[in-house]
Regions:
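Short Pro/Gly-enriched beta-strand edge/turn motifs at strand-loop
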Residues: 19-24, 121-125, 146-152
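Active-site HxH/HxHxD metal-binding segment of metal-dependent hydrolases
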Residues: 57-60, 64-145, 162
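Conserved beta-strand hairpin/beta-sheet module of binuclear metal-dependent hydrolase folds
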Residues: 15-65, 165-178
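C-terminal regulatory/interaction regions
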Residues: 248-311
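Short acidic-hydrophobic surface loop/beta-edge motif
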Residues: 17-19, 41, 140-145, 215
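Divalent metal-coordination and catalytic microenvironments
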Residues: 22, 41, 51, 66, ...
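Metallo-beta-lactamase
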Residues: 46-48, 52-56, 142, 149, ...
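N-terminal amphipathic/basic leader segments beginning at the initiator methionine
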Residues: 2-23, 149
Length: 311
């Protein structure tokens, strides 16, 4: 196995940023498919990690960086949601307490490990086994890192997924928000809700007095990113309304759309999956979107090529 964090040196090494005293963000470039951010909180005798990485190799590199900061063991792992880029590496942590919202555990078990499906470029996942949360909560849970409170909060409704959890450090004013925010990348709502994400960001996330936000992908940011992401989601809803009125499917609506200010965001093909979800949000009688059909449409939008994945 390569000792590097990844097999794509052009991406550059992950950045370790101390966003507050004893609180670190681990930022993996370039934040595209399956290249996520994690973070950790250093206590006197133990460490709390927020999320794992997508591959064995990346997760081991992350654990090495934690060990470079403190000899204290990682005893607790919090999953912000069930997606594999944040949870596949759970098993690499060994026998520790894994915490997630109750639907996070259920979705991890139901979804399993992805493998190489042809939707994305092939990935060397490493030796992985499914490791869902061993402790679950419904709405809120408070952890302690020494004398530092760490508050877990389910956002209350589907947004990025059905089980998004905020990790808020009130004394440090640091928020880990998982994939509710992407910084420089296109948000992805196929397994959540576009309308729900707008409501969560505006009524749950925005009121939190965060001085620093570690998003699920991209650079550490401030609260200004919330409005930027909400603007994109409202743009998606407007395209969906037009598509439904014209009777065109999501792929055609996406192909007819000029992305404008969002064209430079990474993974722009997500507009297709987002429209599949937005159609269902606006017309609930459609039920849930067909995930494989939506992902296949994203490949079609990408010129028939598998989606770029350099995890």
């Amino acid at each position: 196995m390569s000792s590097s964090a990844h097999d794509h040196p052009e991406l550059g090494p992950p950045q370790l940023i101390e966003v507050a005293d004893r609180v670190f963000g681990y930022i993996q470039p370039d934040g595209t498919w399956y290249i996520n951010n994690t973070g950790f909180i250093v206590g006197d005798r133990s460490v709390i990690s927020i999320d794992a990485c997508s591959t064995e190799r990346r997760t081991r590199a992350y654990l090495d960086r934690i060990a470079s900061v403190t000899p204290a063991p990682v005893t607790t792992l919090v999953n912000t949601h069930h997606h594999g880029d944040h949870t596949y590496g759970n098993c690499v942590f060994g026998d520790i307490t894994i915490i997630g919202q109750e639907r996070c555990r259920a979705e991890i078990i139901a979804t399993g490990l992805l493998g190489n499906t042809g939707i994305w470029e092939p990935v060397d996942w490493g030796e992985l086994t499914l490791a869902p949360p061993t402790v679950t909560f419904t709405d809120r849970l408070r952890l302690w890192s020494g004398d530092l409170p760490v508050d877990l909060r389910y956002v209350g409704q589907p947004a990025h997924t059905s089980n998004d959890t905020l990790v808020w450090l009130p004394e440090q004013q640091v928020l880990f928000c998982g994939d509710l925010l992407f910084n420089g990348g296109t948000p992805f709502l196929l397994m959540g809700s576009v309308t729900g994400a707008i409501e969560v960001l505006t009524t749950v996330v925005a009121p939190i007095p965060a001085a620093a936000i570690v998003s699920g992908h991209g650079a550490v940011c401030g609260p200004d990113l919330i409005g930027t992401v909400v603007g994109y989601l409202r743009f998606v809803l407007e395209i969906a309304r037009r598509g439904l009125a014209a009777g065109v499917p999501p792929l055609d609506a996406a192909r007819d759309t000029e992305l404008g200010e969002y064209a430079g965001w990474l993974d722009s093909e997500r507009i297709v999956g987002n429209l599949h979800r937005a159609y269902c949000d606006l017309e609930p009688s459609r039920g849930k979107p067909d995930l494989f059909a939506a992902l296949s449409d994203m490949v079609a939008y990408n010129g028939g090529r598998p989606l770029s994945c350099r995890a």
